[in-house]
Amino acid sequence: MDNLVFSLNATVAIFLMMVLGLFFNKIGWMDEEFANKINKFVFRIPLPVLLFGDLAVVDIKEAWDTKFVIFCFIITLISITIAIGISCLLKDRNIQGEFIQAAYRSSAALLGIAFIQNIYGNSGQAPLMIIGSVPLYNIMAVVVLSFFKPGQKGMNKALVKKTLIGITTNPIIIGIAAGLLWSALKLPMPVILHKAVSSIGGVATPMGLMAMGATFDIKKAFGKIKPTVIAAFIKLVGFVAVFMPLAVVIGFRREKLIAILVMLGSATTVSSYVMAKNMGHEGVVSSSVVMLTTMCSAFTLTGWLFIMKCFGLV
């Protein structure tokens, strides 16, 4: 029950922020043009700063576990490959990129540490899970959203070059790289800088969620209900059911299993919507999957946690 309450506290708050954005739009306080400007701002400043702050304070050398990081990386890569394969069955090719990203991209950085701290009292292996998965999440998001952009026809040198430039100049990837470099060099984080990073990064989620809610089109969302439900099922149930037994067989337990659970089965992150909108996609599937997985993840995560506890794994 405690885990259900914790999950509900985390997910309901996120959902209410989206509803608040929708409400602001309906009463004329946050029109679509304003919401789109907020999206661009969140994408360029607060979100990269948030990820930088999460990774910069991690002691990589002390917490390092090569097997665990490699496992997280490989499973993330396989998950993305599966999502790409399933997306080929979609009739509407214009939503393929959004579907792929929404199906694999978790709220790992935002939810991972908090979820494990609630259970064990410390962040455990969450930082290593973030290192193994989040950089790949974002690099592949740029690749997927570039190659499967609406109206895009085939691959060519210009597209490959544009994608590579997109990866190296993507604000989120720059934030992750800066955070990892800061941590690897063991640079001190002055109190003033830490407070500034926390303050700027702290607005990423609420602003991004409200902007997403403000641009959410209910009619269009219902028109994309089938791919939305499929992507949400893959995100919350499919990948966990496939890969969690493998993690158990390999020997991962307790904090590591919880970190893997969050990586595989947490709600789709709001940054997937922010990035999709900023890379020329409609954003309807992204926002719909974020909303649906956010509503359902409190119950699915708690269900998976209950199953693992019954088997004495956590």
What are these regions (language model features)?
Residues 1-314:
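Alpha-helical transmembrane segments of multi-pass small-molecule/ion transporters
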